[in-house]
């Protein structure tokens, strides 16, 4: 039972049409969800992620035609990033014109390596809770932290290490090419 899925994602550089920060633009496809199911989902999410209560109304710009469950996905992604990366952002949620059931989510980020996985994890968590299944939240948060830590390691030191390894393998003496004198005949 797949209620929602991410059908497209793009990374936007800073100073884009939505934010001055770099953003992840995602298109979410959603099957209709009843109001009662959305209410149960919200209560389960609040129990699993108590910080979601603070995010209600702080999500940023939102279109009126967007179902509450899409806003819950966005709030969940923001809360997961806050818990895993200590990253607080506001986002944008809107409808995709002339495409019923598709919604645009824009989430600014500081750790690009964890932006898309955080949204994917949020959709998996929401799908699991809508279906009444459990979800290993601790493992997901640990994975997001690991992805963000990978970004923090300086690439310069990795390049120096790679260069040192290559230099130890490559012979130090210059290769001599045979000298070809022009023929005079």
Describe the predicted segments one by one:
Residues 1-185:
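Preference for protein termini
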